[in-house]
Amino acid sequence: MAFSPWQILSPVQWAKWTWSAVRGSGAGEDEAGGPEGDPEEEEDSQAETKSLSFSSDSEGNFETPEAETPIRSPLKESCDSSPGLAEPEAKPQESREADEQLVAEVIEKCSPDTCSRSSENEAPQATVDSHPVKDVRGKAEHDVSKISVVRPFSIETRNCTDDPAALGTAAAHGCVPVLPGMALPSTTPEATQDEPVMDRGMGVTLEAFTEASLKTGGPCPEPVASRSKLRKPKPVSLRKKMAPEPEMLMEGSPLPKASSPWLPDGLDQNANPSVLRGSGAQRSPLNLKETAGVLSNDTSDSGVEVAPGSPPLQLEDDFTEDGENVKIRSALPKQSGRKPSNKLAPSIRKDGVSKPVGVEQPSDPTVQDALLDQMSPKLDPSKRSHPPANFFGSGPILQNSPPLSSKCSHHFDPNNINTDDSGDPCKPTPALTSSGFCPATGNHVNEILDSPKKAKSRLITSGCKVKKYEAQPLDLDACSQDEGAVISKISEIPNRDGHATDEEKLASTSSCAQKSAGAGVKGIEKETCQKMEKEELAVHGLLESSSEKAPVSVACGGESPLDGICLSEADKTAVLTLIREEIITKEIEANEWKKKYEETREEVLEMRKIVAEYEKTIAQMIEDEQRTSMSSQKSFQQLTMEKEQALADLNSVERSLSDLFRRYENLKGVLEGFKKNEEALKKCAQDYLARVKQEEQRYQALKVHAEEKLDRANEEIAQVRSKAKAESAALHAGLRKEQMKVESLERALQQKNQEIEELTKICDELIAKLGKTD
């Protein structure tokens, strides 16, 4: 298996690469954010640092530093797509102060001869209320970090006809016309305090104001020198530092204003117009209802025709949150000396409800007068209680105004750009005559921001590319569309709240590269839409400039302030040429992004192969480890069983040994008894031996005595036998003698018997003879 740099990295390098991928380019912006450290920022950074410890399941295996990573981080790519964000961020304090003085000089030159009527109405108020500005500041600087995007309500007030274009430009961009000899007591301290953070945010506003003044013929040549310094737009997450100024100026500063009443002075000077959208949506609904009467009154006095079916006061959706909570937050005082957090994600409160796109304007003149009265700066309650006192002098000025032409509006749906190429993305829609350029984008961003939070991720929401010709507010309106597109892209990056595998990291970076390439294609179509919008608005500007007695041009909240600027043919041609050049540039940039995407895609595929091999190796290692663990578990179980058996045997042996010991003790006692018996038996044996010896002695004595007696008996027997033989011989001789006698008698008997028989026979014969004779 081939090794790659991914497999031989240290944990420190991996942590650095993961940190850079999560933070993007936000690290440098945090360092330039201000000299003071915010506790909330420190907590957020600590939370992000902690979340990095759970960023991957293979942190200890391989690391990839920023320089060796073949895939760019998602946030950096989205940020690099707008070259205006890639410029240096730090700016010396002297250049900031010079910019502030330059803006003040430009305003003084543009307004000393053109603001006489408004100065007469409002100069006493400025002198009276300029002192309490510092007193009100403590309670006015409440936490309005939630208000990150404000859109100016385009009502330009022209107090005279000397230089209406320059004054209209200043009014459109929110610049404050100042009387000769009058300083800016409210904007300068606030700008000085928040300048380290607001510098890039206010660059677009100042540049737009100065260039529009130059093009319209105003005597303002000085701002050209500082344009390179001012072209440093800052992401929305860091623009929120300039939010404490609007409320302070609205509550405590009664300076004369030619800007929109819904856009305070501090916000007009410091906020980027590319994100100043939907400020009316951030006010309470009561203000809209009250101000409707003032506006309708002024319109009826001056003869302005208002179409009852087309609401001209439609406002864009808030990009961060719904406006229902803004009024409550504005009433809460902010702790002094503390800046709002520059993190976008932690400071946004999500509500599932978005503001309505438009607010219908009533046709009643009294209602319109009340509307203009409510849109004026917040003054003391005694002055606000008199509706006829219009601080803009709208009653006498609007009397000769010509009827308003139907306002051009375009329905721009970024979700349907690439689906239908044949359709015109900038087709005018009569149903949305007064809506903003990107209401769908606002709703889309609201849906993104209303989604549940996960880990804290740094979202860079400023995707607009600020050029020299983008002083026109129409281009800045299109920037808000780019903002929504960038938010929708960046929000799809997976949040790193837990363990993220290496494949997820690669997939997230590749998807971001694809979306950044698609953003270039969308930018071309957006430029085409902007071109058509500029042409139509230029026609409206010519129609309004044709009337010499039209000091006021009322534009709806969804349209650009370009209607109040009188453009010449040369200016329009130059603008169109610049737009065409920008379209070509965007096409080239899109092609470059496509090439970068293909290269990155090849690298991602290669890395996926490497990761697949790595996963196979890891799987094999895990398999071997599992087998080893199984065998070790089996052997361990066997050893455990053997151990248990040995323990059982040991217990039985111990029991046997204890029994043997007891038996041994018993046998020991028995043996002692045997020894005692042996001794007794030995004694008995000795006694028996002694007795046997005694008996032997007695036997010997008896034997000798018996032998003597036997000898005597034998002698007596011999004597008896000799005597018996002599007696038997005598008896035999007497027997023979007797036998001879018997034999002699028997023979004598036999002779007698024979003689008897012979005599008997002689007698029988004689008797027989005698009986015969008888």
Swiss-Prot record:
Residues 28-46 have a biased composition (Acidic residues). One of its GO terms (biological process) is cell division. Residues 228-241 have a biased composition (Basic residues). Gene3D superfamilies: 1.20.5.1700. The keyword Lyase does not apply. Belongs to the TACC family. This is Transforming acidic coiled-coil-containing protein 1. It comes from Mus musculus (Mouse).
